[in-house]
């Protein structure tokens, strides 16, 4: 029994194979998507937790209200203590007065939540696996051929890949042509490989990788890039 279970544990899922597409519907070879990234079981609760934390961290948290001690004015007693028949008052900046301070109002705070890196990575892999199972991940050799940006070319190419509306385009930071080509396209979000996150994957209908960006995401930065960053 132990030998059988050990054999099953050592068995690995086969990598997914996708065609590398070019404009006009042509294919330029294939590329493998590692099963440990693009074919894992999606944990919905984990993805929800990670996305919630990401959106919370994006909040500015600069909201603020003034208490009666912070509102300008109100130093003088509005009327005498006794003899008026009215309730005694010490300041016109008390909460019950118009223009007075706020009680228990919002104050600046940090909404960020601590999320372990392993959880963030697992949630991202689950989101990518969900898109891969539904044929919503595409790999292209380059979004626009040449060095001249073209919004029209990029738009037509994305329309060939899918008839769905929202695209997450993962391209290398050095691919200026691709960044400029999709900058003005509605419902198309360009992103660098090291910025890929669970929320953006789930918020898009299709994820499009350039070959360069896919390699950078799967294998990490190259040695040359690491030397430049030092």
From Swiss-Prot:
Source superkingdom: Bacteria
One Gene Ontology molecular-function label: structural constituent of ribosome
UniProt keywords, alphabetically: Ribonucleoprotein, Ribosomal protein, RNA-binding, rRNA-binding
GO BP field: translation
Record InterPro entries: Ribosomal_uL4, Ribosomal_uL4-like, Ribosomal_uL4_dom_sf
Pfam families per the UniProt record, alphabetical: Ribosomal_L4
GO cellular component labels: ribonucleoprotein complex; ribosome
Region entry Disordered, spans: 59-113
Subunit structure: Part of the 50S ribosomal subunit.
Stated role: One of the primary rRNA binding proteins, this protein initially binds near the 5'-end of the 23S rRNA. It is important during the early stages of 50S assembly. It makes multiple contacts with different domains of the 23S rRNA in the assembled 50S subunit and ribosome. Forms part of the polypeptide exit tunnel.
Family of this protein: Belongs to the universal ribosomal protein uL4 family.
HAMAP family per record: Ribosomal_uL4_B (MF_01328_B)
This protein's name: Large ribosomal subunit protein uL4
Native organism: Nocardia farcinica (strain IFM 10152)
């Amino acid at each position: 029994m132990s030998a059988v279970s050990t054999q099953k544990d050592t068995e690995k899922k086969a990598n997914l194979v996708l065609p590398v597409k070019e404009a006009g519907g042509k294919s330029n070879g294939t590329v493998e998507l590692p099963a440990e990234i693009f074919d894992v079981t999606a944990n919905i609760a984990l993805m929800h937790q990670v996305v919630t934390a990401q959106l919370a961290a994006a909040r500015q948290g600069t909201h603020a209200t003034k208490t009666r001690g912070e509102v300008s004015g109100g130093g003088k007693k509005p009327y005498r203590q006794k003899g008026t028949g009215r309730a005694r008052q010490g300041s016109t900046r008390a909460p019950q007065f118009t223009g007075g301070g706020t009680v228990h109002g919002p104050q600046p705070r940090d909404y960020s939540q601590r999320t372990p890196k392993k959880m963030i990575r697992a949630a991202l892999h689950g989101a990518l696996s969900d898109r891969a199972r539904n044929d919503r991940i595409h790999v292209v050799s380059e979004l626009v051929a040449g060095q001249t940006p073209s919004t029209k070319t990029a738009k037509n190419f994305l329309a060939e890949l899918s008839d769905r509306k929202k695209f997450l385009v993962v391209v290398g930071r050095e691919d200026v042509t691709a960044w400029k080509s999709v900058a003005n396209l509605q419902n198309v979000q360009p992103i660098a490989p090291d910025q890929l996150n669970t929320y953006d994957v789930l918020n898009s209908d299709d994820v499009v990788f350039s070959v360069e960006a896919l390699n950078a995401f799967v294998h990490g930065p190259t040695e040359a890039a690491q030397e430049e960053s030092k």
